Each structure stands twice: as structure tokens, then as C-alpha cells.
């Protein structure tokens, strides 16, 4: 499984972001995640941001506010055309996700299907290998969900996209190939391996139910990101141990790309050192452990196979419960999904407080002499 090594870049200045992107591309990264604001989405800024980047061979992923999505697709497509890129080779994503706003802030976005269908049609003409819509299940993971919840609600989320986009006039093949799943990775090593294996199996069943013309449409495109829920301010270097095993889980389970969250993100803006360590954690697995040379090593393992079936059953049960409530959109609108995730978060925090869930360096072998107040970076509040 030769997964892509992705690093996220928060774009404050396009020239600085471009310099950073070109630098990290020489250090093992082959997938970039640009987080852009509306002011950055102009022909001039796009040219400056992607200057000297081989966009035919480097995966380019964008994150922006949903209101900027159409402008971003148009501007990116125009830039690729201006430099004569073979768009049948250029890959990436735009991560259009109106549900995230509903989940976080309760703001409804009723015409999401029409808007998404329009964006997909536009992107299909300009950048046919880019995926437009996303399922950001990583937010469930970071909020403290259990593994079965993250998977079950992610499947319901993906099914909501399939249903809405086919009703908006797209074929199931067109719709399925536009969805990218962004999962989190917790420290539960074998269960995370099983989760990704179960995800591919269940998603294939869901897409098959829509009767696609090509079996290739049942393939799940997955990006994995190490969890922020278990990252601590105290004894922060222990975060490296957690993120390393999390990355191993994702790599062994066959995801398409991985982002390792820098170990110091809980108390400061990650610097060059922590970002370099995060990159090297993946390079260690590829270049020294050769995890990219094997295919599904968990296959045939009694333990992993049984975990896969167990998680699949639990996740499928949650998927059906969500569908019974009217689908993912209605469940989010009613606050059902939020209530379930919040309840799990409260339960997990209580378990950590009682040492029923172990967090190394915090409730297990803590450093009692450490003080953290001095290293927390002050940030302006809105």
C-alpha cells in the first residue's frame, strides 16, 4: 500500500505558503493540503501558490469555506489550463462539506445537494480527477466518538451524499467517484486496522445497492489523520508515541493518504521541528519498515478478521438507526448525531479521569514536576 504522505499548510501569505510547499516536497511529502481564505482565491494568488509545483504528479487538496467552493474550482481549473496541465493525470480534492457547519454550529444548508451537483459538473469539465465533496468523519474522532460511531455515521454521511446527488441528476457512478472520506485514527491499534477494512467492505455494499454500471465505483477513497482527542499538553512528546502507532494502523489497513498531526498542536502553532518529525514518522514506516510494500497484512488473521466483522456489525447498526431517523441530514438537523457524539465524549473524559481509559503521560506515569502554563501559546479569541 503505497499511500501518499500529506502535510497541511495554512495559507496566510501565498508566497510563503508556496515556498514552504516546494521545500517539503523535497523532504518526502507527495500530497499537499492548502487551507485558503476567500482573499487567496484569485488567478494571481493561485499562480503564486502553485508556482513550481508539479501538479500532474503531486496531489493538491484544498480546504475553504463552502461559499468559496465555486470560485475555488473555477480559479484552480483556469490555472491548470493556463499552464497546459494534463487534467487526466492531475489529482486532488476540494472538500466541499456543508454538513461540518451544521454539526459544529447548527446552521442549516438546505440546498446542499443542488449546490454540490453544480460544483461537481463544473469540476468534472475542468479537473475530472478531483473529488469535490467530502465526508469529514475525522471531526467525530477528534470530538471523542467511539470507533463504531465514527464509522457508522461516516457511512450514513456518505449515503446521504449518494442519495442527494443521484436525486440531483448525477448517476451513482458519477456521485460515488466524487466522495472522499476523511477519517481520524485513534490509538486503539488493531481496532483501527479493522475499522478501515470494515469501512471499505460496508461502503462497497452501500454503493452496490444503487446498482452502479462499474464495480470500480464501489471503491472507497480514504484519507486518514491522526487523532487530536488524545493529544496532551503535559508530557507532549508522548504524543509522538500515540501518533506513530496510529499511523501504523492506517498504513497497514490500506488508506490512500495520511496526515500526521504535529505533536505540539495542542498548545502552539506547529513549528518546522514538529512538522519535520510528523513527516519523518511516515517516512520511517515507508523507507525503513517498508510498510508500503505489503498488501492487507491483516487478511487471514483470526483476531483482525473477527474485529473487522464485529466493528462492521456495530457500525451497520448505527447506520441503519440513522437511516430510520430520516437519513444523515435529518439526524444532524434534529441534533441526534451531535447528542450521541457529545455523550460519548463525556463518557470518555470520565473514563480518563477514573483511569479506566489510559492516557500515557497524563493518567499513567505522569511527570509531576512539569508545568505547562509557560509553553501554551496565547491566541486571540473571537
What is each model feature region?
Residues 1-188, 219-223, 251, 257-261:
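Catalytic alpha/beta active-site cores
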Residues 1-26, 238, 242-246, 350-382:
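Non-catalytic terminal/interface segments that mediate subunit docking, oligomerization
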Residues 28, 84, 203, 253, ...:
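Conserved, mostly hydrophobic/aromatic
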Residues 127-162, 244-318:
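Mobile "lid/hinge" segments at catalytic clefts and subdomain interfaces of large enzymes
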Residues 145-151, 186-198, 227-240, 268-278, ...:
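Short glycine/threonine-rich loop-to-helix capping motif typified by GTGT followed
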Residues 166-173, 207-214, 292-296, 330:
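Inter-helical turn/loop segments and adjacent helix faces that build the functional surface
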Residues 196-202, 206, 224, 244-247, ...:
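Extended, hydrophobic alpha-helical segments in both membrane/secreted and soluble proteins
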Residues 276-382:
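Catalytic-core signal marking the mid-to-C-terminal active-site face
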Amino acid at each position: 500500500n503505497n499511500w501518499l504522505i500529506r502535510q497541511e499548510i495554512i495559507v496566510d501569505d501565498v508566497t510563503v505558503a508556496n515556498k514552504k510547499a516546494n521545500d517539503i516536497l523535497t523532504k518526502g511529502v507527495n500530497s499537499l493540503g492548502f487551507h485558503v481564505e476567500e482573499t487567496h482565491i484569485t488567478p494571481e494568488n493561485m499562480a503564486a501558490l502553485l508556482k513550481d509545483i508539479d501538479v500532474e504528479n503531486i496531489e493538491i487538496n484544498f480546504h475553504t469555506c463552502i461559499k468559496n467552493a465555486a470560485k475555488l474550482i473555477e480559479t484552480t481549473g483556469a490555472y491548470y489550463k493556463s499552464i497546459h496541465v494534463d487534467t487526466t493525470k492531475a489529482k486532488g480534492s476540494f472538500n466541499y462539506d456543508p454538513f461540518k457547519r451544521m454539526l459544529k454550529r447548527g446552521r442549516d444548508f438546505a440546498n446542499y445537494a443542488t449546490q454540490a451537483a453544480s460544483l461537481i459538473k463544473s469540476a468534472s469539465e475542468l479537473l475530472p480527477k478531483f473529488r469535490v465533496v467530502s465526508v469529514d468523519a475525522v471531526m467525530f474522532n477528534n470530538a471523542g466518538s467511539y470507533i463504531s460511531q465514527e464509522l457508522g455515521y461516516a457511512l450514513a454521511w456518505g449515503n446521504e451524499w449518494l442519495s442527494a446527488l443521484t436525486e440531483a441528476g448525477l448517476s451513482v457512478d458519477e456521485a460515488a467517484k466524487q466522495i472522499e472520506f476523511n477519517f481520524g485514527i485513534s490509538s486503539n491499534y488493531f481496532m483501527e486496522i479493522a475499522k478501515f477494512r470494515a469501512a471499505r467492505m460496508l461502503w462497497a455494499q452501500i454503493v452496490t445497492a444503487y446498482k452502479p454500471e462499474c464495480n470500480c465505483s464501489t471503491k472507497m477513497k480514504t484519507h486518514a489523520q491522526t487523532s487530536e482527542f488524545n493529544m496532551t499538553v503535559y508530557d507532549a512528546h508522548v504524543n509522538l508515541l500515540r501518533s506513530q502507532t496510529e499511523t501504523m494502523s492506517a498504513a497497514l489497513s490500506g488508506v490512500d493518504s495520511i496526515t500526521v498531526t504535529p505533536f505540539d498542536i495542542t498548545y502552539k502553532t506547529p513549528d518546522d521541528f514538529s512538522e519535520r518529525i510528523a513527516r519523518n514518522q511516515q517516512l520511517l514506516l515507508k523507507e525503513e519498515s517498508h510498510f508500503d510494500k505489503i498488501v492487507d497484512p491483516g487478511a487471514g488473521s483470526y483476531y483482525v478478521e473477527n474485529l473487522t466483522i464485529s466493528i462492521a456489525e456495530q457500525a451497520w447498526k448505527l447506520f441503519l438507526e440513522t437511516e430510520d431517523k430520516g437519513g444523515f441530514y435529518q439526524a444532524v438537523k434534529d441534533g441526534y448525531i451531535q447528542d450521541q457524539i457529545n455523550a460519548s465524549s463525556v463518557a470518555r473524559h470520565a473514563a480518563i479521569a477514573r483511569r479506566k481509559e489510559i492516557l500515557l503521560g497524563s493518567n499513567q506515569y505522569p511527570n509531576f514536576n512539569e508545568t505547562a502554563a509557560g509553553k501554551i501559546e496565547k491566541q486571540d479569541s473571537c
